[in-house]
Amino acid sequence: MKMKKLTSLCGCLLLSMCMGVGAMTAPLSAEAAAREKVILDADMVDLFDDGIAMMMLAESPKMDLKGVTIVIGNTWVETGTASAIRQLEGIGRTDIPVYMGVNETVRKDRFANMKEEKRIYGRGHDSHLGAAGYPQPASWQAEYRKNYNDEPVMNPQKEHAADFIIDTIKKHPGEVTIVAIGSGANLAAALDKAPEIAPLAKRVVYMAGAFFCEGNVMPTSEFKFGLIRKPLKRLTALLGRSKSSCRWMFAARN
């Protein structure tokens, strides 16, 4: 109970800080055009890296967060959607749209295989299984009510996350940065559907992989690379063949 109260208090303090920063640094209209257009693609959780990254992007005067796309990974899309909506409500940014995306591992047996690989090869430095560690929720609304004991103020958009990525990049060629801190499957789905967007993105910043150390869930694999391998191979292949100046950046996790 004390831990729950402490977590709630920390969350309220952080949300208040974000709201304060936003009020103090509200960008002028003349500066709006210069802000970097960003799509955040995340397997969203409350606070931690995903939630904090979203709030920083939402409140930065240098960033124009066009939308948040939710993908399977640390959480099911239903859980991630509820989390993103709750946090955007908390900082008063219900104007930022949320899109639900890829909610499966492509290979239907991937979750079971991950557990078997852990048994055979041993664990990495934690026992994280993400969405594989709990049953898929019935809906994002059910997750919201269960986790926050409240009713949501906003709703996710009807458009699929991959379609939103495609539409936004085509609308703003050479201007959109994709910050992918989830599994990357939404971006892979977008590139599968519309490979012509590869040279139109400004850059892709992707957080995944374990460099110069063992993986976090298995000695041979970092969680996100281990969860969805095939889409990531397509993703890197498509962007690698692009003749544009789109930059492909990795942020290592260890």
Residue ranges of each PLM-predicted region?
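Positively charged n-region of N-terminal signal peptides that target proteins for export
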Residues: 1-10
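N-terminal acidic, glycine/proline-rich low-complexity segments
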Residues: 27-254
